[in-house]
């Protein structure tokens, strides 16, 4: 979970994830939040022990680089399933179970929490952001023929093998286009994606 000034949400999102039926570990990648986000996480580490980790970075370096740092950390720790999600509850933590089951039980390599399929929805977003995101996904599908309706989705479960195959050091985008590039590279490498 990448963070920058998420003091309002961070404890709630951590507690919610840890309340789920499945056992999850959480890595917070904090980009030097001046609001005390990292301090809240460190305090919660006393309660959650070896399930909660923090990677503190100096200054705001971009969403994509935060995810890449988290992915590299997760690969070294040998996690089989690696998730990405936001801290602001724009992704429903209850759906982590659905993403996990899709990869673990259904043989999918990349499970995408899509906002633009029949059962998907958008939470806590203004209308203009929805239009921009949907338009970007439509444009990407037209250009690449990638069979993903929500190319900019940031709620994803990857098998570790996908992240090991993609050369994370060659990812070019550090902003929201990072989401598109990751899905495209997974698809081009022959991995199975499901929304």
Features from the language model and the residues they span:
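Active-site beta-to-alpha loop of glycosyltransferases that engages the nucleotide-sugar donor
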Residues: 1-15, 32
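Acidic helix N-cap motif at the loop->helix transition within catalytic regions
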Residues: 8-12, 35-44
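Residue-level signature of catalytic and energy-coupling elements of molecular machines
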Residues: 10, 17, 70, 88, ...
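Short beta-strand/loop segment that forms part of the nucleotide-sugar
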Residues: 14, 23-33, 55-56, 85
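Short helix-capping segments at alpha-helix termini
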Residues: 19-22, 45-51, 78, 105
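A conserved acidic beta->alpha catalytic loop
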Residues: 30-39, 89
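Acceptor/aglycone-binding surface of glycosyltransferases and processive sugar-polymer synthases
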Residues: 57-76, 81, 93-176
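Catalytic donor-sugar/metal-binding loop of nucleotide-sugar-dependent glycosyltransferases
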Residues: 147, 170-174, 183-195
């Amino acid at each position: 979970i990448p963070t920058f000034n998420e003091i309002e949400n961070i404890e709630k999102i951590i507690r919610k994830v840890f309340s789920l039926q499945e056992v999850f570990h959480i890595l917070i990648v904090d980009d030097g939040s001046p609001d005390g986000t990292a301090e809240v996480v460190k305090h919660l580490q006393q309660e959650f022990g070896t399930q909660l980790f923090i990677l503190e970075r100096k200054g705001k370096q971009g969403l994509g680089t935060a995810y890449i740092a988290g992915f590299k950390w997760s690969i070294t720790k040998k996690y089989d399933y690696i998730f990405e999600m936001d801290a602001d509850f724009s992704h429903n933590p209850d759906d982590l179970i659905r993403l996990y089951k899709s990869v673990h039980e259904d043989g999918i390599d990349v499970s995408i929490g899509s906002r633009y399929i029949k059962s998907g929805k958008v939470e806590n977003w203004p209308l203009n952001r929805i239009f921009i995101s949907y338009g970007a996904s439509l444009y990407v599908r037209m250009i690449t023929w990638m069979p993903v309706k929500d190319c900019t989705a940031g709620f994803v479960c990857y098998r570790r093998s996908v992240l090991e195959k993609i050369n994370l050091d060659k990812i070019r985008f550090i902003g929201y286009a990072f989401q598109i590039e990751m899905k495209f590279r997974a698809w081009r490498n022959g991995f199975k994606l499901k929304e």
